[in-house]
């Protein structure tokens, strides 16, 4: 079974170094930890502490790839909103100079304004090693943004 390092930062942790490094867990244990967090309560704490951050960081023990889900306290909607950041690299060709030259652009998988269900689904993809699914979703969102 694959193992993952888990680090949780609550609003009362003033700096990134204060986050709780909880150790190595299997996939199901990580999902249980994610479900056990009262995200609404974390949101209220974040707002009370003005600028505090709640994050859930998972690192693959083998590849050292990392995925961080952060709760966005200042979302425009009433629903919980998450931001996903990762070090999952994507290299995309980018046409330049009247379409004659193709350059490669390096980017990292990241999403904003994710619902709780979307955040959990992306976490599940990461834990299952389905990085191509994350990359494809990121690319499709980027394409939609370019067309808009």
What are these model-derived regions, one by one?
Residues 43-45, 91-96, 121-125, 146-148:
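Low-complexity, flexible helical/coil segments
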Residues 33-37, 83-87, 139-141:
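Short, surface-exposed, polar/charged, turn-prone segments marking secondary-structure boundaries
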Residues 26-31, 101-138:
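Ampiphathic alpha-helical segments that act as solvent-exposed interaction surfaces
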Residues 1-21, 65-114:
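Intrinsically disordered, low-complexity regulatory segments enriched in Ser/Thr/Pro
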Residues 2-66:
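Negatively charged, low-complexity tracts enriched in Asp/Glu with abundant Ser/Thr
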Residues 135-148:
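Short, highly charged C-terminal tails/helix-capping segments
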């Amino acid at each position: 079974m694959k193992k993952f390092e888990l680090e949780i930062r609550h609003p009362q942790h003033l700096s990134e170094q204060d986050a709780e490094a909880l150790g190595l867990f299997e996939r199901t244990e990580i999902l249980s930890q994610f479900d056990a967090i009262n995200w609404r309560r974390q949101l209220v704490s974040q707002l009370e502490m003005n600028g505090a951050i709640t994050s859930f960081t998972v690192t693959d023990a083998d590849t050292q790839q990392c995925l961080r889900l952060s709760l966005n306290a200042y979302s425009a909607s009433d629903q919980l909103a998450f931001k996903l950041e990762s070090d999952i690299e994507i290299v995309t060709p980018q046409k330049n100079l009247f379409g004659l030259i193709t350059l490669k652009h390096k980017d990292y998988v990241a999403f904003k304004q994710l619902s709780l269900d979307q955040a959990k689904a992306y976490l599940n993809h990461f834990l299952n090693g389905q990085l191509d699914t994350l990359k494809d979703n990121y690319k499709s969102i980027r394409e939609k943004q370019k067309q808009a």
